[in-house]
Amino acid sequence: MKTGKELKPGTVIRLENDPWLVQKAEFTKSGRNSAIMKTKLKNLLTGYKTEIVYSADDKLDDVILDRKEATLSFISGDTYTFMDTTDYTMYELNAEDIESVLPFVEEGMTDVCEAVFFDERLVSVELPTTIVRQVDYTEGSARGDTSGKVMKPAKLKNGTELSVADFIEIGDMIEIDTREGGSYKGRAK
């Protein structure tokens, strides 16, 4: 059992016998009213999203999910096929099921992901916190005011755009932090 104040992004709770992923949780306490937790939830089975406000002392059932290592096998349209690295079982997910990691999923990637199962059904995939990707396009370096941290836009092979350091060039391998939508960490070693 969890209380409302213990909810955080990534927590999975059970509502009406379905697993719901907490995507966002914001704790608020005012002088007059009791503390509340505003949450954005996603049903892991249907993909339905909703917002619910919980009292800090509301009791909620948490869900234990099974996790296995998997790699991306291939992409066919909006269907992504992942393979279990231990028994080579293939699992399919739609693009909407993995929308939070979709900007960093690309054909031929070798990252070992964490496949998340509920009642032996694959419901989502989580990438490692740091991944390495190749810069497909970026502008040239800016000359002049470089006293601070100078960033410029770059595009990855799958079309994802993010800001990178000014010295990064086309073809460079960069490290990306996949939490919170992804951000540039540095040049890959």
Swiss-Prot record:
It comes from the Bacteria. Keywords: Cytoplasm, Elongation factor, Protein biosynthesis. It is found in: Cytoplasm. Pfam families: EFP, EFP_N, Elong-fact-P_C. Its main location: cytoplasm. InterPro entries: Elong-fact-P_C, NA-bd_OB-fold, Rib_uL2_dom2, Transl_elong_fac_P/YeiP, Transl_elong_KOW-like, Transl_elong_P/YeiP_cen, Transl_elongation_fac_P, Translation_prot_SH3-like_sf. One of its GO terms (molecular function) is translation elongation factor activity. One of its GO terms (biological process) is peptide biosynthetic process. GO terms for cellular component: cytoplasm. Pathway: Protein biosynthesis; polypeptide chain elongation. Belongs to the elongation factor P family. Involved in peptide bond synthesis. Stimulates efficient translation and peptide-bond synthesis on native or reconstituted 70S ribosomes in vitro. Probably functions indirectly by altering the affinity of the ribosome for aminoacyl-tRNA, thus increasing their reactivity as acceptors for peptidyl transferase. PANTHER family: ELONGATION FACTOR P, ELONGATION FACTOR P (EF-P) FAMILY PROTEIN. This is Elongation factor P. It comes from Pseudomonas syringae pv. tomato (strain ATCC BAA-871 / DC3000). The gene is efp.
